[in-house]
Amino acid sequence: MTQSLLLEIGLEELPAQYVRTSSEQLAKRVEDFFKDENLAFESVEAFATPRRLAVRVNGLVEEQADREEIFKGPSLAIAKKDGAWTKAAEGFVRGKGLTTDDIYVEEVNGVEYIHVKQHIAGKSTKEVVKKLSSVITDMKFPVTMRWAAHTFEYLRPIHWIVALYGNEVIEEIGVLDVKAGRISRGHRFLGKEATIENPESYEKALAEQFVIVNQDERKALVRKQIEELAAKNNWIIPIDEDLLEEVSSILEYPTAFAGTFDEKYLVVPEPVLVTSMKEHQRYFVVYNQEKQLLPFFVSVRNGNDYMIENVAKGNQKVLTARLEDALFFYEEDLKIPMTTFLKKLETLNFHAKIGSMTEKMDRVQLLVGRLAKELNLPSDVVVTAQRAASIYKFDLVTNMVGEFPELQGIMGEIYALKQGETAEVAQAIREHYMPTSADGDLPTSVPGALLAVADKLDTFLSFTAAGMLPTGSNDPYALRRQVMGLVQILAAFEWNIEIEDFTKLLLGLDYAEFLSGKEEEVEAFILSFIRERVAQRIATITKRHDIIDAVVNSNTSSVPEQLKAAKVLSAVSESEEFKGITEALNRVINISAKAQDDASGEILEERLETESERNLVKAIQELNEKVGSLTPEELYSHLEVMAPKINDFFNENMVMVDDEATRRNRLRFLGLLSQIILDFADFTSLIVK
């Protein structure tokens, strides 16, 4: 026989972002509880609304299975003396509720120990579930609060608990002064208390009180209602999945409705209107079949359709006030010339320790030029990027961005066009913030990518040079995100810049004033920090840490080259030949590392003594002449071909011979080969089997 179990925690309104994660955590903890208690079940269902977290365990067995547990005691030498059981043995069995007659002997690692088997009768599920309170109190949350005079902390105050095993209340469950029962609560305004007779009746009992407890069901219902409104009015209503998730997490009984606003607000740029509706009001925006924004919106009420027209009017009133502000800000911003905005940037701090936003733009202009020269970019790209760099932060002091900070860059593009800038300059201004997340969109234009790299590099270098380094999980200036974005752009545009050498150069040129005598410390941190971000990027290609280390520890810090090398190693690492190739290349790296002082100078042909030595040197010299033009794939192919020549050389020749001239000569060409190998990867980091 099996039963079902229901556990519901009634709370004050939860923040939308924690509803689903908290529900999933509760379900996992309940599942683990029954697994740990050796109680089998068929399934665990999770339920959640802003006012409750609940789980139902289906097909829960009525008792634990009996089991035998083996206990190891002291060694036989201690447990038995002169043919009689010692006090140690008697104490051991007495502690298990057994006698010395139950002892048997088994050998463990060559030593005999006494053992006993204890029969443990399974407990009834009814007895075990009395301990479920710990599941509630052990839950962890990002933020917590206290209430009343209690010191106990939880995501939100607990107001009621429903705990049923079959038809019976588990009365032993409780938290603080809240004891379990079978009374749940319906919708805050439309519903009443709901008596839950058994776990199977949970959804129905609460649905009668205007609560849909299944979050996915609410989500599907909201989607269906929006699609019906779109079909009825011949609209296109894009359904943003994040917004849909949020909306379904802040209501218990959804009813979608349409509202409208004055057409005069359509002169305001679309991103402003969309942000006002979507981000600030949690509305879904409406388009016609030509994908033009319409003066309508769709919202979702937490309730039924009673007096829904009044609800729509109330929402329209709130939105109108916000759009009126947006229209005013837009019209005022259009009256202000670019020079005025740029003047204001002189008094806008980028950071008190670093300087103004104008000073940042000056540094970024220099950086754009240095990067463009390093990357050999066309002059028209440089002109566009430098013009953008000279004004790209101007929108930060506009009225619109002051009200809608999430539109920085977007309004920069719109206003730049209005001020007469070229489309390319305006696009670069918008794109310099990209990417805004790990999987966010990247710039599509070269000037935009160039400006984005320069801006991110300046932010990173100026903060770190000034000593404001991220520590642990604390990264107040989002430097990890800045550098990861930089790495992503370099990879996407295949810009082969030795980023480590370049940043060292920049520290001495443009950021020396911030360093305050800590050049070596800051430089070491910067290089390590960049390598960590590159390693994270490589981890999207391969999960093998040895390959990641091999690539990151190579001689190159060109991100595209490193990513390509990682792909090559990931592809060839499972081949039969890879172990032999790696071992051959490692012999070269290892012997060269031990004798670097002897490896300088020119390779002397007259000192080559054997055929294998001459063959290897010829191959090294040929490879060295073209290594700069080879892709990582091509370079590995050459190293693969060279591996047998390396083995032949080591089989026939000794490197560390007594003759100094011969020894030095061999170390020279092996040192050269080692550098070529390390340009691809540090093979000594690889684990081969």
Regions found by a protein language model. Give the residues of each.
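Amphipathic alpha-helical "coupling" segments that flank catalytic cores
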Residues: 1-689
